[in-house]
Amino acid sequence: MSDKIKPSEVSEVLLQQLQGISQSAKFDEVGTVLQVSDGVARIYGLRNAEANELLEFENGTMAIVMNLEEDNVGCVLLGSTSGIKEGQVVKRTHRIASIRVNDNMLGRVINPLGQAIDGMGDIDLKGAFEMPLDRKAPGVIFRQSVKEPLQTGLKAVDSMIPIGRGQRELIIGDRQTGKTAIAVDTIINQKSFYEAGKPVYCIYVAIGQKASTVAALVQNLKEHGALPYTIIVSATAADPAAMQYYAPFAGAAIGEYFRDRGYAALVVYDDLSKQAVAYREVSLILRRPSGREAYPGDVFYLHSRLLERAAKINEQQEVAEQMNDLPECMKGHVRGGGSLTALPIIETQAGDVSAYIPTNVISITDGQIYLESDLFNQGFRPAINVGISVSRVGGSAQIKSMKKVAGTLKIDQAQYRELEAFSKFSSDMDAVTAMTLDRGRKNNQLLIQPQYSPMPVGEQIAILYCGVHGLMRNVPIDKVRECQDAFLEKIRSAHPEIIETLASGKIDNDISNGIEAIMQDIAGTFA
């Protein structure tokens, strides 16, 4: 052979290849499945696992660490237990349970892991923020007092139990009393803010509901044009208990994504009674000690740490940027002045608000809207018992015109209920009592509102002005609602400036005289 192999060249090539070899070995920390049952697995060998860390099984199923014991780790599965057997290998991911969030989620239905479940394809998560499911609530220094109203579009709520941005207002009542209807109407009412370029992003969390119920709700939101600013997080009754337990945390994490970037967000938890039941199920299978009604001892902490994440963030940029427990991905993107409002829903049994979970959540929230089946059956809908419903934020979450007009409405209605109880025993009454009773009955009629028809705040103030000042005294009780519709039709078409002025928070003698003149004309046709 003419070409001789030169040893020096061979050694040079080998040397170059050896220098390019990476000496770092890749280690995976793994454990083995000891036991698996009812959506919970025990794993041996993961001695460095952290609480709330994601684990991966051989078949790709994910799990979250909940129990850290001396010789094993208890984790809850976020999928089916089929295909998981004793002795299988489980891998640490070194990631704390989180959800990837971006604006492409708006209008979609997702599960608590952030995966689309609405059959419309995967969500483009390019540039998404990794938001932790469980996160410490903002400290006092990073918060601001609640003073901006969150308009629900419901006369009874906006006038007597006002909700502010950053507040936590509980909706409580028996089944079939219209709890979800109040929350859905509130979401639909945010449409005008979205169209005006000042969106309130809404997150509806469905916990343990039927898939058909969630589908009907999505269809309703779509029909009323509320989907473009709404995200639905759903863990249906068919999903594992762990998914139902983590669904509200996923909703809160999505809400924080908007809140920390300076936007207003609203999250509805429907309902937390089912989350508590799911948590009880998981805890008992993990053999945690049980307490009252077999709930684990930390069920209060479960709801308090979830609801404390609702807040109005300080408007000062330099303060907001220093917020505690800020995710790494959010640094540099924080804007002050954002808010997260929470509307948790609790279902009571036979009106018993003194049960364990209802009293817990009542004590955590900033007020409650109490719905009664008796009122619902009598046709007063929304069936709000104004006597025991309260908002601890009060008038500071109302615009000035609403505060001025509806300031006495709650006391007036309380006085009416008291007199009504006495009037059943007495046939003769003085003129003042008769007038108070008449006005109270008519105000009750004015506060009735059909579902899916939230009312703009300017129109609410105009009609409530008529009720509070007794401008309908000559209208028969059965014609009050017709009179209201005719009045609103007239004021919308002929005097839109009155509605605009009231909505801006102003009310003066000219506006009052204008309302009185219109109602006088309309009431005359019904008298």
Regions found by a protein language model. Give the residues of each.
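Acidic-enriched and Gly/Ser
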Residues: 2-17, 23-26, 32-150
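Phosphate-interacting basic helix/loop segments used at nucleotide- and nucleic-acid interfaces
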Residues: 13-24, 152-157, 251, 306, ...
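P-loop NTPase nucleotide-binding/switch module
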Residues: 88-90, 97, 101-104, 117-168, ...
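Walker A/P-loop NTP-binding active-site region of P-loop NTPases
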Residues: 164-217, 271
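Loop/turn-to-beta-strand initiation segments
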Residues: 199-201, 228-231, 262-266, 337-342
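Nucleotide-state-sensitive switch-loop elements of NTP-binding domains
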Residues: 200, 210-254, 284-296, 303-308, ...
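Phosphate-binding/switch loop-helix module in NTP-utilizing enzymes
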Residues: 243-279, 331-332
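Conserved catalytic/coupling modules of large nucleotide/cofactor-utilizing molecular machines
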Residues: 274, 281-527
